[in-house]
Amino acid sequence: MHKRAIYPGTFDPVTNGHADLIERAANLFEHVIIGIAANPSKQPRFTLAERVELLKTVTAHLDNVEVVGFSGLLVDFAKEQNASVLVRGLRAVSDFEYEFQLANMNRRLSPDLESVFLTPAEENSFISSTLVKEVALHGGDVSQFVHAEVANALTKKAN
């Protein structure tokens, strides 16, 4: 089965939870595109170019994973990338309602685009980019939550 999947997100920064889901998706699909949303309304700490580079570092060992920045509608990006599946992560029940609404909107806009939900490993289920940034901002050690390169980048941003 030839399936191209997109795992979209802001990834500001990419966490071990994201990396876990990327590995799971890479085992399920022939080709996985990490679609990094420009998303200026979220006021990301890292630029789009920085987020792309960090994701490339984190996924360098995965031959079937590609990292691409994008802006605009996700369904349009999926069509440009010839992807038929969107991969989304669910950490807790609280994520489900938003993801359910998003999946239905995407299906309405692009009926052939299917959403697949993956859950992270238990040890990553509480990690969020927001929490990681908050810990780093206050000088805390985030090395157990992110790749070493990401931890270094966060330290540089905090100083």
From Swiss-Prot:
GO process annotations (BP): coenzyme A biosynthetic process
Site (Transition state stabilizer): H18
GO cellular component entries: cytoplasm
Disulfide bonds: none
Subunit structure: Homohexamer.
Family stated for the protein in its record: Belongs to the bacterial CoaD family.
Name of the molecule in the record: Phosphopantetheine adenylyltransferase
Biological classification of the source: Bacteria, Pseudomonadati, Pseudomonadota, Gammaproteobacteria, Alteromonadales
